[in-house]
Amino acid sequence: MLKARVITALVLLAGLLAALFLLPAFGWLVFASLICAVAASEWATMLGFGGASRHVYAGILGALCLASGTVAGLHQEATVAPFGLAPVYAVSALFWVLCVPFWLRARWQLPGRGAAALIGLVLLLPPSLAIAHLRLLSPWLLLGVMAAVWIADIAAYFTGRAFGRRKLAPAIS
């Protein structure tokens, strides 16, 4: 299992590095939008959306990411500073800081698929735009942020394997 994970990670890393350093700004924005669409498809599956509705939702979020990034200027090289992203990032930060802790503590159930779809928008669109934005600032900066996340994830995995007695989030893992 670990060997397959490592091989998969190396193949994906090679593709990511090629895209990160070789694609023009618009190509990277398209790449980030595709990542957003794939994540939206996964979110829709967790919500119980089936077949066409899952693909439509994923397509809408991917297109919205591409359109928002283009309007913000993320499709151009670094000569133009992106604008209009602060409110998007602020809404996301407020959601994570003010809503998510209470949501998890109270174990709130989503009121319906429509509300869950809107929450997916708040969960998926800002990070996708941030990936495009950080790459515009510096591919090395984005790679550093991603590496920090990867290192933390790998450390948590091995720490859990070595010292974990019970799962902290059995509903997730």
Predicted region positions:
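Membrane-embedded alpha-helical bundles of polytopic integral membrane proteins
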Residues: 2-173
